Amino acid sequence: MPLFDSFAISASGMTSNRLWLDLITNNIVNINTAGKPGDPNLQPYRRQVPVFSELLEATTNSVPGKERYRRMGVHVPRITEDPASPRLVHDPSHPYADEKGYVAYPNINIANEMVNMITATRAYEASVTAINSAKSMAMKALEIGRG
């Protein structure tokens, strides 16, 4: 693998994990965003989840019909909304309460979001460490080249 590919792969991981952290933050911020059950115009916030995918690059020496690919990191081709039903809370005094007195809130579990946040942070840190290691190797190679 060429040296600069390691920078690109690590950078793609950092970018994807930063997006994941942004989505987690959005989920936590909107945990108490209310909606009105049954009203399509007043639906509660839906938890957003990134879909991760490999970045693949076709190699130049591929035989037609037998393409070969190099792994070039990760990216987020799309963001999905959690299909889980909203949680209903009985609060007849709320302005969004339905005729039975229920208000819809996002079905977001704060503990799961915190675990995801720690996971994304650790993955981001691993990418930073990989970039620093690649940088150190490049510097050593330059020193060796100088003689």
For each predicted feature, which ranges?
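Amphipathic alpha-helical polymerization modules
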Residues: 1-147
